[in-house]
Amino acid sequence: MYRDVSSCNTYDYGDAVYWDARYIQEGGSFDWYQRYSDLKPFLRHYFPLSSAILMVGCGNAVISEDMVKDGYEEIVNIDISSVAIDMMRRKYEYIPQLKYMQMDVRDMSFFPDESFDGVIDKGTLDSLMCGTDAPISASQMLAEVCRLLKPGGTYMMITYGDPKVRMPHISKPVYNWKITLYNIPRPGFNKPEGSTSSKKSLLEPIPLTEAGLLPADWVLEDPDSHFIYVCRKVKDADV
């Protein structure tokens, strides 16, 4: 129902076989969507350096390494691809702040409830939304993310999906998340000449409508920009 197939292709991005083959073929490092330097204002704003962080769908990205260089103390990285995890374990063998585990984000039962202060998702839900049984996979992943977050913890999702296709999944009452939305242009984007839009602070949230959609007068200057959904797990006392 809410599978945004316009951004998908014929590959099953929820399948470990696909990712194993891709990492064997490509090797090297690759950061999806945004680099740490672009995301740093958001990450430092929402995640103290002492946070216990889970990076889901880590692949062979260097964002966790960059976060450790910036002072982050504990990042657990998981990915469905054993090829990627083996590669990253060897690469970061002597960096104790980084741990790598092969795991399906739809079943993270290895971890006890409320294990993490923060969960970072850079394109992982997007991948599941391009796989088979996408709505089921999304629900399984988000339920696990919610379970693993401590009360007051934060799930940060970086995605190409606008609120029309993402809010139906993340705004379910069962998760009890307070959601704040941001927009960030793709790396290297420059405003078109003659643009009259006012300069906004990067950390200025987008005011969603009551239906959880973008305001009618909100202008998306970069059509290939990314959305950042900050989902804070509400404590009982905050309700």
Q: What are these language model-derived features?
A:
Residues 135-151:
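A short glycine-rich, Lys/Arg-flanked "PGG" loop and its adjoining helix->strand segment in the class I
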Residues 193-239:
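Core SAM-dependent methyltransferase catalytic element
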Residues 117-136:
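A short SAM/SAH-binding and catalytic strip from SAM-dependent methyltransferases
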Residues 151-159:
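Conserved beta-strand signature within the Rossmann-like core of class I S-adenosyl-L-methionine
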